[in-house]
Amino acid sequence: LRDLHVGVIFLLLFCVTNFGYSQNLVVNPSFENFINCPVKLGNLELDVEDWSMPTLGSTDYFNGCSEAMGTPKNFNGQQPADFGVGYVGLYMFAPNDYREYIEASLHSTLEKGERYTISFYVSLAERSDFAVKEFGIRFSEFPVQIETSKVLSSMHFSKLKGDTSNELEIKYSKFYSDEIEWIKLTQEFVANGTENYLIIGNFKNNKRTQKFQTKRKITKGSYY
């Protein structure tokens, strides 16, 4: 699958803040705190502190300390990190509904009824064939671990313990097709009071995913 370069996106610097307070509630928001310097694909949760993969999808971690999984240059192209030297990469769109996600823990449970802002930066990998139009965010009360490498659907979440009902979708007027600059995504939301973790990715199957073909290739994917 790594040779498909279907819809790859790089993610950098996550932030969840309460209105009126500037404290970032995401632990290790820019992926700078790592356990191991990355040397292979799909090893994010063993390499990065406080981040995990909620499914069997093999999300990647890149850091300037590594030759094999380095920044700014790696197997998916070249992209410097604006904050430090680390970022992650995942498939937002790929054949057979294959998906990759990342899960973060929050410093504290969000307060019920309070307004928050979530923001993060994305950049389409140079070797991607497709760009997507929207990013999904799902909050959960407990850590999520589901035995699938395909789309995380509402059916999956309905079977989990705890509240997973707070979900967001950040849409863009165009498509997230910039391969040079980091694009900032921001969304406001009201907390349920049960949010301890957040998951980022594409929660729609291929048929429902709004996408734009950036290159004419036989392979079909979107990696960021």
Predicted regions and their residues:
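Aromatic (Trp/Tyr/Phe) and Gly/Pro-enriched flexible surface segments
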Residues: 23-112, 121, 125, 132, ...
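Serine/threonine-rich low-complexity intrinsically disordered regions
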Residues: 2-5, 127, 147, 156
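Bacterial Sec-dependent N-terminal signal peptides
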Residues: 1-26
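Short coil-to-beta strand junction motifs in C2/discoidin
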Residues: 130-136
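Short aromatic-acidic-glycine turn motif
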Residues: 143-150
